[in-house]
Amino acid sequence: MALPALVAAAAPAVIGGIASYFGQQETNAANAKLAVWQTRENQAEAARNRKWQEQMSNSAHQREANDLQTAGLNRLLTATGGASTPSGGQGQAAGATMENSLKAGITTAFEAKQLGMQIERQEKELQNLAAQTRKLNIDAKVAEKRIPESDLKTKFTTNFSPVIDRVINLEDSNGPRLSNLREEKKPNQMPLKNGKLNT
């Protein structure tokens, strides 16, 4: 493969790899920002819950006394410990999903190269199929032309063989058989023309 063709074949893979690398860098940065934001939001919500728990805990006796009075009971029964304090939320830190940018770029470049090789192989297979199809078409045309010729030879041989055999086997009353004349003919002897030897 010539160098320009090699560069042209490798260019999409390299460009795809670089794009994947920088794309993964952007994704990682966005994931990190999102994780920081989620952590801050979770911590703020946890702080609000702790404040609410503290308020509930600080007002436990007052709430219990009010509840007892509303129920028509003596407020002094609050000496038992106060109303229960519900549990609140806890802050959680979010983890960012981080991917290896270089791996993404290499993987994309490798996949692009494999795709290029696969396309090239398929193109060659299509060229081979086209060549085979052309050969089969040519063979079919040759066979079509030979079949009538072969049929004609077969018909000729079938129809004229008996006639030829009779001519060869005829006996001339004044001379030898024609088949014997063939055997006696000398290789350098020229046929007769007007009763004279043609030289």
From Swiss-Prot:
Domain of life according to the entry: Viruses
Disulfide bonds: none
Subcellular location, record wording: Virion
Major subcellular site: virion
GO cellular component annotations of the record: viral capsid
Family under the similarity heading: Belongs to the microviridae H protein family.
Protein name according to UniProt: Minor spike protein H
Organism of this sequence: Bdellovibrio phage phiMH2K
